[in-house]
Amino acid sequence: MELERYIPETLKKLYLYDDEHKGELITTLQVYLRNKQSIRKTADAMFVHYRTISYRLEKIKQISGINFDDANEVLAVSNGLIIYKMLKEIE
């Protein structure tokens, strides 16, 4: 589908990793962005220790190369998450 081209490659790598490893990195990323990139709020929302979130975020950066300091990249990833969810609902 044409919308798929708006999903950044960085995000596609993360989806693949999560599928292969039954991970929660995508969920962690969604909650982290929803909580304005606050590790503490993300940990509270997910009922895990903040160090768990820190570890997952490092893993996310390692796998995908996402730069959370780049506002344009964060916006592209946020939009990609929404588009991916929409495409899954259509299937």
Where do the protein language model's features map onto the residues?
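Cytosolic nucleotide-utilizing catalytic cores of signal-transduction proteins
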Residues: 1-91
